[in-house]
Amino acid sequence: MNTPAQKKITIVDTTLRDGMSSVSHQFTPQNVADIARGLDKAGVGTIEVAHGIGLGASSIQYGFAAATDPDYVRAAVDAVENADIAALYVPGIATLAELQKAIDAGIKTVRVAVHCTEADCGQQPVEWAKEQGLTVMTFLMMSHKLDPEPLAEQAAKLDSYGADVVYVVDSAGAMVPQHAGDRVAALRQVITADIGFHAHNNLGVGIANALTAAENGATFIDGSLRGLGASAGNAQTEVLAAAFERAGWDTGVDLFPLIDTAEHIVAPLMKEPQIVDETALILGYAGVYSTFFHPTKRAAKKFGVPARDILMELGRRGVIGGQEDMIIDVASELAGRTYETPALAGS
């Protein structure tokens, strides 16, 4: 009697990129090597490494990292035996020269991230990276801001440029499972590239969103050990591995080495537990980009305005990544008038 083939999912780990945001980009190359080695031993096939915002982001605006991106990449490359090392490239922050340095340091995969309405901005780096022989994964950031069909139209552009994988990216942690499933299903109807899903956990449903995305056609799922990541953090790699296995999926990774790496290497490096606090929750509820988390907390303290009110107003204005300067504008405006917590547009 034949049995159906087990469903397969590929877990990509971003502890050493998105997780950098939780430690103020202060992982050392030795930390990177130790974590990458543990992930590699667990069978994780792709490990993303860079400043938390991506290549070239170490700056006064986004925070200075403890080392350079090439130093981080080399540390990871030297530590692994089987895994590919990837880096995040955001047009407008990184340059192709910085991507070339990452290639020289040993990356095999690049992840090109564009705002969900701006797939055109990915054409040059995607095509250039393919010419260099890289595997190219692409991110449609803030995917909650587009309905499924328009999002699929943007995905089709990235597919046409040669992307190997197109990700639905919940940058704000604003999605619930139906949102994740509907968007992935829409992409599956129009693109031939593989589909990925990148969750943030602001509404506490990062794992559920990832499972639903997979059931609707995603074959690449991002996670980070201990959930390390911007604001409320990402779907937790070791929990993803356990949940997918329980749901009947073949992840190709070994759960116990993942847990050991999370527990004994990552946890001692954490500045604080990765939790859904008030600011993280409202950030997801308001649909604001995850990098606004710490600057909003600082502005709230400086201006004596509740962080949630700042975030609700930013959500009403529809801000996106790169508009962090709006935080100060909104905080100062709210501090100068009598206000009530603003409602979301359309609510």
UniProtKB/Swiss-Prot annotation:
Keyword Ribonucleoprotein set for record: no
Domain Pyruvate carboxyltransferase as annotated: residue spans: 9-259
Site (Transition state stabilizer): 17
Reactions it catalyzes: (S)-4-hydroxy-2-oxopentanoate = acetaldehyde + pyruvate
PROSITE patterns found in the cross-reference section: PYR_CT
Protein family membership: Belongs to the 4-hydroxy-2-oxovalerate aldolase family.
Listed name of the protein: 4-hydroxy-2-oxovalerate aldolase 4
Organism field: Rhodococcus opacus (strain B4)
